[in-house]
């Protein structure tokens, strides 16, 4: 039997959002298995831990001093400044720590992402020797949804380094979105947290922080990414960033997972 764990990571600012996602998992998601919650700057309440059957995990904070020194205090000229203001996003790389080799598969969800149907529709996907994640360009595939728009061009030497190490073709390719993913832990033998952190400090031009590095290593270097199917086997959309991405009317009931839903509030419980 395949051993699977769901993983979330949160700081105190996103704690309530994380709990919403976990409650979704336990109720509408029908997940009775293991959930690991990585906490950053607080300790999880024992009552919550017991009530939701959570394993709390802590890792040493990823050192970002070298990264910040290379980026500079003002950040990139073409970004929303998350590279200097949303540094906890890099802590998501802990989800590729060798600690997770005790499971066969790891399913990661961002704090606040809504689980709107049974997780079986995610877990029935074949992720053997792969990482599955949404295509950032889906469903509309606009011309600006390719990798060249994910990086800063402020440092010409850094851009040249990426082209030299990964080829120029990657700039025109689609890339994974990393608010949720499912991976086979065998890929940690190819690329794990240590390599990702090394790349973080080497390729310091990613406007989307850890998402850019995950694409460079899992997708472009090691060819491990496979995109989610648009529809799950139940006929619903497997994942969407927001219902408004579709030109036709949909509601949360048409999806299995949504990052930022507008037809259901964070405090609402999905009732199918």
What does each model-found stretch correspond to?
Residues 1-4, 8, 14-20, 37, ...:
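A glycosyltransferase accessory/donor-loop signature
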Residues 15-16, 41-48, 141-142:
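Short, charged/polar "capping" segments at the starts of alpha-helices
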Residues 24-32:
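Short, acidic, metal-binding catalytic loop of nucleotide-sugar glycosyltransferases
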Residues 34-41, 133-135:
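Short internal beta-strands
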Residues 39-45, 115-119, 231-233:
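Short, polar loop motifs at secondary-structure junctions
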Residues 46-100:
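Active-site-proximal specificity loops/subdomain of glycosyltransferases
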Residues 62-84, 142-168:
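Charged, glycine/proline-rich intrinsically disordered loops and linkers
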Residues 88-146, 183:
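GT-A fold catalytic core of metal-dependent nucleotide-sugar glycosyltransferases
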């Amino acid at each position: 039997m395949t051993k699977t764990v769901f993983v979330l990571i949160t700081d105190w600012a996103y704690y309530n959002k994380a709990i919403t996602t976990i409650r979704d998992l336990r109720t509408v998601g029908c997940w009775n298995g293991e959930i690991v919650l990585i906490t950053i700057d607080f300790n999880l309440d024992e009552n919550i831990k017991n009530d939701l059957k959570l394993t709390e995990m802590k890792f040493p904070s990823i050192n970002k001093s070298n990264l910040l020194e290379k980026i500079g205090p003002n950040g990139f000229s073409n970004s929303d400044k998350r590279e200097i203001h949303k540094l906890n996003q890099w802590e998501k790389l802990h989800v590729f720590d060798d600690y997770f080799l005790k499971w066969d598969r790891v399913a990661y969800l961002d704090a606040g992402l809504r689980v709107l149907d049974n997780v079986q529709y995610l877990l029935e996907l074949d992720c053997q020797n792969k990482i599955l994640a949404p295509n950032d360009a889906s469903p509309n595939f606009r011309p600006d949804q390719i990798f060249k728009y994910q990086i800063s061009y402020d440092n010409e030497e850094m851009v040249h380094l990426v082209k030299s190490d990964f080829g120029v073709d990657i700039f025109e390719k689609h890339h994974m979105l990393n608010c949720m993913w499912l991976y086979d832990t065998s890929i940690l033998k190819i690329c794990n947290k240590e390599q990702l952190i090394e790349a973080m400090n080497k390729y310091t031009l990613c406007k989307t922080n850890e998402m850019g590095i995950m694409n460079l290593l899992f997708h472009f270097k090691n060819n491990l990414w496979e995109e989610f199917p648009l529809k799950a086997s139940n006929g619903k959309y497997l994942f969407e960033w927001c219902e408004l991405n579709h030109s036709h009317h949909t509601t949360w009931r048409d999806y299995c997972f949504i990052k930022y839903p507008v037809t259901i509030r964070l405090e609402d419980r999905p009732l199918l």
